[in-house]
Amino acid sequence: MYYEFDDDNIKSSTDKLISSNKIRKNPLFYGPYKVSKVVRGQSVSWVPNEHYYKGKPHLKKITASVITPASVAQSIKSNKFDVTQVSNSQWPNIKGTKGVNFIANIPLSYSYLGFKVGKWDAAKGENVMNKDAKMNNRSLRQAIAYGMNVDQVYKRYSSGLSFRIPTLIPKQFGDYFDKNVKGYTYNIKKGNELLDKAGYKKKGTYRVQPNGKPLTIHLAAMSGSKVQEPIIQNYIQQWKKMGLNVKLTGGRLMEMNSFYDKVQNDSKDVDMFIGAWSLSSEPSPQDLYSAKAPFNYSRFVTKENTDLLNDIDSQKAFNNSYRVKKFHQWQAYMDKEAYVVPVANSYNIYAINNKLTGYSLEPSKSMGGGFPNWYYVGYAK
């Protein structure tokens, strides 16, 4: 038995569905609430879904509004909203606010520094590594990692609510996390030693490549909160202390869409980049770092990496101790090679009106991903 599909008809039907009222105006909802009103770019209102299998939820209406980051602190102080996500840099200004409870969780996510060492081959559906790429030198990558004073940065700019992480497998994954991998702590001296031994000699202020050519490294980084600019400029200054000439791609921080357009398309003016991942509950890194993963933005491909990733997802990995062992080996390998260097994770903090009940981020009482189960959320009179 076989099935034959008309790709053109499927695409036509899909395009029509995407723009149809069934999707845009009157979609089906299976949760406790359904959308009642959308003000484009401003707010979305939700009302109880009369078809929800558990029955009627406790709130008559929920309105989610978009506000600027600069107005978050004042909106919390004035109790304008019942639920507000707090930027860590704003915590000192709002932590004593009356009438609210603060709750937090550590999400399955992390930021990282990636080094471009190849291209994505769309025709073959695979990453192709360039052995002659500027950043395809392990000592250079390790030195750059040692030049990041992550602990100092987040102590100053996030009140300690963001923190350095040592591996690409978060601690929340239990035994799969390798506590013996320590990552790269700030060490300018060690970075300089690595560069010296690798032949990156100083000529004036900056170092040159081992072949004697000038070395300019272009860093792509996203814009964000008001502390993002000083954080990135700090790293650039730390690297300068090591004699590395690092410049921002395009001369400035980029908004998210422009950033990922350049990173995904392997733009020539990106040598390294600071990105971030939100992870699923399955810890396998196959979809982010394998040879055929489009999300492997560094484009590194090695036999050892491929073998370890395949082992992690193999039939043998049904034996948990075997899978734990392979996860640990992979983390140690990635730490050594430094194609992708884990940087930090952060607490997600929410300011909650103290009259709200049932709002919880505990796994057993929430929808996961930092979202409560709104069916249980109510308002105390």
Locate the predicted segments by residue:
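Gly/Pro-rich hinge or "lid" segments in bacterial periplasmic/extracellular proteins
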Residues: M1-K54, K61, I188
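Ligand-site clamp/hinge motif
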Residues: N21-R24, N49-I94, N245
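Append "and occasionally in soluble cytosolic enzymes with long acidic Gly/Pro-rich linkers
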Residues: V47, D132-Q237, K241, Q329
